[in-house]
């Protein structure tokens, strides 16, 4: 009996120890699983909070970037694809050659080089004149008090509500009449086109510069007047140096708008040798069954180069010029 009991006790002790070990292992496994689940839940909550706070902004930014870059990539692909159709450019950069650029400069009936020079001349002259005349007008409105000042500022804003497209017929008749007296300012002349552009650009740009001029303390003008400086000396010696950002912004915006303007330029410039890029490039796609979109895309790429170069050169002035010019002191 005692031997049996001893053997029974001897055999049950290891069984109890094994059960305890299995229970401990199970508890440890359950605890480990719970910790992992908590970590996973925490990660999910952290990602949800991040996406709700900032993540959606990144998603919107990526979508907007793709939406903006895709047309540029498509135009580049069409420019380097000599098939001449946009359908052949659906597979981006499937074919790369310079055939379109060669054809662009080898067509004597379509002088692309002359169009490029015309665009640069019209754009530079108009931008420079807009900056200079607009700065003088903004200085007068900002620093001088004269009869009709408020009415003049209000008129500048009201005139900008009517697009130049509504005045195309009037512009055509006006230049047609001027060409009978002063041919250099009439139809077919680049100088006449520059005058039309100046009339449309001075209003909004003058008001934009007027707001920036008001941020310059008038104490500088008063100190210069005490030293005997005139308005001309104050304007050229002091004010222009302090308002360089807004001058750069106005010049850049004017140049971009003029380089891409088509409607008025197509009405005023009738001679192919005097046309700008926007009007000249349209001839590549104007005729049905003979349009060449590849050459058109190549010309558009080259036309964008000066604008991009000017934008990069004046980039440091753009933000400060627009933000300060939008606040009227």
Predicted regions and their residues:
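A hydrophobic, multi-pass inner-membrane permease signature
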Residues: 2-8, 15, 21-329
């Amino acid at each position: 009996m005692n031997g049996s009991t001893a053997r029974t006790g001897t055999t049950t002790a290891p069984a109890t120890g094994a059960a305890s070990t299995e229970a401990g292992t199970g508890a440890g496994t359950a605890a480990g699983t719970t910790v992992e689940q908590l970590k996973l839940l925490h990660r999910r909550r952290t990602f949800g909070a991040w996406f709700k706070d900032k993540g959606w902004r990144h998603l919107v930014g990526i979508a907007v970037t793709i939406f903006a870059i895709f047309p540029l990539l498509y135009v580049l692909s069409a420019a380097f694809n000599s098939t001449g159709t946009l359908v052949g450019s659906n597979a981006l950069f499937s074919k790369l050659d310079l055939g379109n650029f060669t054809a662009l400069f080898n067509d004597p009936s379509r002088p692309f080089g002359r169009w490029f020079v015309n665009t640069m001349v019209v754009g530079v002259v108009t931008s420079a004149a807009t900056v200079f005349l607009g700065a003088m007008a903004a200085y007068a409105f900002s620093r001088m008090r004269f009869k009709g000042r408020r009415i003049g500022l209000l008129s500048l804003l009201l005139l900008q509500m009517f697009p130049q497209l509504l005045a195309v017929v009037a512009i055509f008749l006006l230049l047609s009449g001027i060409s009978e007296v002063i041919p250099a300012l009439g139809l077919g002349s680049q100088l006449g086109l520059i005058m039309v552009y100046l009339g449309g650009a001075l209003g909004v740009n003058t008001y934009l510069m007027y707001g920036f001029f008001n941020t310059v303390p008038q104490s500088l003008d008063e100190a210069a007047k005490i030293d005997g400086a005139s308005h001309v000396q104050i304007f050229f010696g002091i004010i222009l140096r302090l308002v360089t950002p807004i001058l750069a912004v106005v010049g850049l915006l004017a140049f971009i708008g003029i380089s891409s303007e088509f409607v008025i330029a197509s009405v005023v410039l009738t001679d192919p040798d005097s046309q700008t890029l926007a009007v000249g490039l349209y001839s590549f796609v104007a005729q049905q069954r003979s349009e060449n979109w590849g050459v058109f895309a190549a010309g558009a790429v080259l036309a964008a180069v000066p604008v991009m170069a000017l934008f990069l050169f004046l980039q440091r002035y753009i933000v400060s010029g627009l933000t300060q010019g939008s606040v009227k002191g």
